[in-house]
Regions:
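A general, composition-driven signal for non-globular sequence regions
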Residues: 20-22, 108
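N-terminal first-folded block
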Residues: 22-29
Length: 122
């Protein structure tokens, strides 16, 4: 599990990535977060200065919302209500933070699995 506070529109917003995220995402949006994040990462790396498709923006909003809701039980129950808290903010400022958080979580899970099979010294 990894947590990070990201500044959005002058507010510190907590995000959390853990093994529960794929399930929470699937239950809320009926989509596969792994496929969606792969698509989002590709769109971001192909067009770092701009030009996201509407689908990419929706994926970003969904992922950001789920990670924020996972970190803070006081997050509003809908994405629209959550987004209404903020003025216009640049996706390019926040998206790298979300992708980094997700990547850190995956790395942490892989390292934990690698180390779980090692015997402890006695």
């Amino acid at each position: 599990m990894v947590e990070k506070i990201v500044n959005i529109d002058g507010k510190g917003v907590r995000f959390k990535a853990s093994a529960a995220i794929p399930r929470l995402y699937r239950l809320k949006f009926r989509r596969d977060i792994f496929k969606d994040l792969t698509k989002l990462e590709k769109a971001y790396s192909d067009k770092p200065e701009g030009g996201f498709e509407i689908d990419d923006l929706e994926i970003f909003e969904n992922v950001a919302y789920i990670m924020a809701a996972h970190a803070d039980e006081n997050v509003p129950p809908t994405i629209n209500e959550w987004l209404d808290q903020f003025g216009m903010f640049s996706i390019y400022e926040v998206l790298p933070e979300i992708l980094e958080l997700w990547g850190s979580n995956l790395f942490t899970d892989v390292e934990a699995k690698k180390n779980s099979g090692k015997p402890t010294g006695n």
